[in-house]
Amino acid sequence: MRIAICASEGAPYCKSGGLGDVMEALPAALARIPGNEVVLILPYYNKIKHNEAFPVEKVAEMQVQLSWRQQYAGVLKLANRNDGVTVYFIDNDYYFGSRTGAIYGNLDDGERFAFFSKACLDALATVNFIPDVMQCNDWQTAPIPTYLKAMYHGTFPHTRCMYTIHNIEYQGWANANFFDDVLGLPWEYRSVLDMNNSVNVMKGAIETADLVTTVSETYARELMYPYYAHGLDGIL
């Protein structure tokens, strides 16, 4: 089985919290299963770029269309991983390479990770890795299931998408203009992402993914209750 995992962080390359730990363990565990081919895609942050422990080679260059804007993306392959996991980084100085400090907390985080989500799909097509399963994580890669269904079905006709919620408190809220100005999705998907007259990319992922999972059975049960689901219990 071909598996592509897309995340905004993954140890040891970049880590902010528990998601980074999961993205260190999960790809390696899946790669140990005979017959699996596993790819992990991460942003090429400044802290990775300047770390000599993570040598890379450029394998492709692309122009990623994000609504009206077109942004360069380099596809870099980690050169020294030997556990069966292929690691690709999405390189873009504007969104990732030139930013110092914390991974999150930029005013344009919504745009940054919408770009990353779309670039993941373009990168997989460019390196000709057509996965059987795509696994996406939290709000940062929540646009992927919707993009996959709305704009990439011809490229990935048999790919199924699994969306995993690690922390439902952060849902990727944006104003209504974000749908047209940044995401650039077809009009018929507006209602899929609409919540209280705003855009909620996690809601969109829940509605368009083939399977929605959480980090544990306990958390999955908790999310059935309004107190824990932060407004998404009706969708779940």
Model-derived regions: residue spans:
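Catalytic cores of nucleotide-sugar-dependent glycosyltransferases that transfer UDP/GDP/TDP-activated
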Residues: M1-L236
